[in-house]
Amino acid sequence: MRNVVRKPLTIGLALTLLLPMGMTATSAKNADSYAKKPHISALNAPQLDQRYKNEFTIGAAVEPYQLQNEKDVQMLKRHFNSIVAENVMKPISIQPEEGKFNFEQADRIVKFAKANGMDIRFHTLVWHSQVPQWFFLDKEGKPMVNETDPVKREQNKQLLLKRLETHIKTIVERYKDDIKYWDVVNEVVGDDGKLRNSPWYQIAGIDYIKVAFQAARKYGGDNIKLYMNDYNTEVEPKRTALYNLVKQLKEEGVPIDGIGHQSHIQIGWPSEAEIEKTINMFAALGLDNQITELDVSMYGWPPRAYPTYDAIPKQKFLDQAARYDRLFKLYEKLSDKISNVTFWGIADNHTWLDSRADVYYDANGNVVVDPNAPYAKVEKGKGKDAPFVFGPDYKVKPAYWAIIDHK
């Protein structure tokens, strides 16, 4: 063995090696300072939307039942100036049966937003999930995707596109004066960089995307803004595939105004550099950018969660604060290219991420969060995530102070 001189690490380098991905010594120091801020009620804390009033609007996703909860209502009025329906404006909620539209729950959200001077995002006109299957059945009730006869396949395609246009026409004409921002299509590109092989695509090819945008513009007019919304827009090969798709559609005259970046992200992934590159790429096409479904999970993928909120270590909240600090500094830097930042929820007491927060146990019944450690049992969706800047008790977290008062 060679004799190797091992030089001692400097304090700064040693600290850097111990930090989560993306965190610098400065951001770690900032996060620690945010932890010392008062753990006060969010109902008395400085208003989040006012902090960014000169940069972009701040939104939250809601379910109608939350509009019956006094604290949720107070939170929305205090901290948010934009709102989006988490589920009740999706196709299966709006038109569960052909020709039978149900606007009751959607109307409640629109009414609340209008009464409180809030912008509204519509989510979503077209999606491969939460869509009723009648869209994809032919006149005889058979699945269109199974048809092999070329003539009948073309007939089925035209029937599907007609149904799609009717769906969009009915909704857009109802809300065009109340809702300015519309997710026209959602998640049309797969993780492999190809157009998602959904029933929409199998039956109609790329034309369903074109018809969706064209119908939204036709019936909504020029005052509404039309978006293509997707997750993992910062990740290759999906990012470039989405870019090429939008570029092609715009060159063909398809009316696309912007990209919605869902931003279901983690403390250490993706990097701010990749996020910045993504925003700049689409802005270069003349498109607006919106952050449409923001949450910062405490966990990696696949999640290995803690079973309760109180079990999550304090350090995780500090790491999350540092991430939010860096993230909103970047959003501010790019605020000429970003018009809205929407959280996919209000506070940590309600988040879709809990449904995939799996808890792993070893043979002795101890919780295992190390992604590389062996385990004996998994309880699906039994854990707790904490992705927002407000806690389940409606108190501010270190992450809140990070984006209100970042340095």
Curated annotation (Swiss-Prot):
One Pfam family here: Glyco_hydro_10
Enzyme class, spelled out: hydrolase
Entries under InterPro entries matching the protein: GH10 (IPR044846), GH10_AS (IPR031158), GH10_dom (IPR001000), Glycoside_hydrolase_SF (IPR017853)
Main location: secreted
One of the record's GO molecular function terms: endo-1,4-beta-xylanase activity
Reactions the enzyme catalyzes: Endohydrolysis of (1->4)-beta-D-xylosidic linkages in xylans
Protein's cellular compartments: Secreted
Keywords carried by this UniProt record: Carbohydrate metabolism, Glycosidase, Hydrolase, Polysaccharide degradation, Secreted, Signal, Xylan degradation
Cellular component terms (Gene Ontology): extracellular region
One example of a Gene Ontology biological process annotation: xylan catabolic process
Signal peptide: 1-28
Top-level taxon in the UniProt lineage: Bacteria
Matching Gene3D superfamilies: Glycosidases (3.20.20.80)
PROSITE patterns: GH10_1, GH10_2
EC number: 3.2.1.8
Active site (record annotation): E187 (proton donor), E293 (nucleophile)
Domain GH10: 42-406
Gene induction: By xylose.
Annotated pathway: Glycan degradation; xylan degradation
Family stated for the protein in its record: Belongs to the glycosyl hydrolase 10 (cellulase F) family.
Name recorded for this polypeptide: Endo-1,4-beta-xylanase
